[in-house]
């Protein structure tokens, strides 16, 4: 629902399905695909991963525009041969800075920024330490070297949450307060305290660019097709 809310004026024909309920053979008829976040860890194995791999095979065959968000970012990179681990730093949560690479700054449908550094909403503990084969790094920070990646012209993945709003992130920080206190005996890597992480939450229009630009790309490709 958050993705739909972020894109309410850009797209109105959505289908939301669990991976195990998607038939790979119909992927060619999709205008675009978004692999969302999930409360799961890809340091473990799941029965649906083989189906997800078949889905990605079809996405590549038909060059379907695809966006991976957080867990989706990790899933796509993993299925292309990348490696996912639990970060030794604990959770990265709150408003964080990411640095765009030259490829990220010049990418046509990633984020509209020529400053090199942007603030985004983050909430995750697992990270990509080796990207998928042929994936290009678009953004990084000291917590995760692969904050965003790209595969050819039609797949983009982001570790952060472009669908989040200010109230959503505050809820996640408060929900994980006890866990964060146990993980971060020293000050958080990106803020001086957990309460400061909540105070730092603000509206971040540029954080949503990765989602908005993806939908615009799907629309453009759909019209040209």
Regions found by a protein language model. Name each.
Residues 36-104:
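Cysteine-nucleophile active-site neighborhood
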Residues 81-167:
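Pocket-forming structural segment of enzyme catalytic cores
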Residues 1, 30, 47-50, 81-84, ...:
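Short, glycine/charged-enriched secondary-structure capping and boundary segments
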Residues 140, 144-225:
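C-terminal and late-domain segments of enzyme folds
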Residues 1-64, 186-225:
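N-terminal beta1-alpha1 cap of cysteine-dependent amidohydrolase-like domains
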Residues 13, 20, 105, 109-117, ...:
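Short, glycine- and charge-enriched coil/turn segments that flank and shape catalytic ligand pockets
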């Amino acid at each position: 629902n958050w993705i739909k809310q972020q894109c309410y004026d850009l797209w109105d024909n959505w289908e939301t399905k669990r991976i195990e309920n998607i038939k790979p053979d119909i992927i060619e008829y999709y205008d675009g695909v978004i692999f969302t976040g999930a409360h799961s860890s890809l340091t473990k194995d799941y029965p649906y991963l083989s189906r997800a791999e078949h889905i990605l095979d079809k996405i590549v065959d038909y060059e379907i525009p695809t966006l991976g968000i957080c867990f989706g970012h990790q899933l796509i990179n993993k299925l292309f041969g990348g490696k996912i681990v639990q970060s030794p730093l604990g959770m990265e949560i709150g408003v964080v800075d990411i640095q765009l690479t030259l490829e990220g700054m010049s990418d046509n449908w990633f984020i509209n920024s020529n400053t090199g550094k942007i603030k985004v909403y983050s909430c995750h503990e697992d990270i990509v330490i080796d990207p998928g084969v042929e994936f290009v790094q678009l953004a990084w920070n000291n917590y995760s070297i692969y904050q965003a990646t790209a595969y050819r012209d039609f797949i983009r993945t982001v570790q952060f949450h472009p669908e989040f709003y200010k109230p959503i992130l505050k809820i996640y920080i408060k929900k994980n307060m006890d866990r964060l206190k146990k993980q971060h005996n020293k000050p958080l890597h990106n803020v001086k305290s957990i309460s400061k992480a909540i105070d730092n939450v603000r509206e971040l229009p540029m954080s949503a660019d990765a989602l908005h630009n993806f939908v615009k790309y799907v629309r453009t490709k759909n019209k040209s097709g």
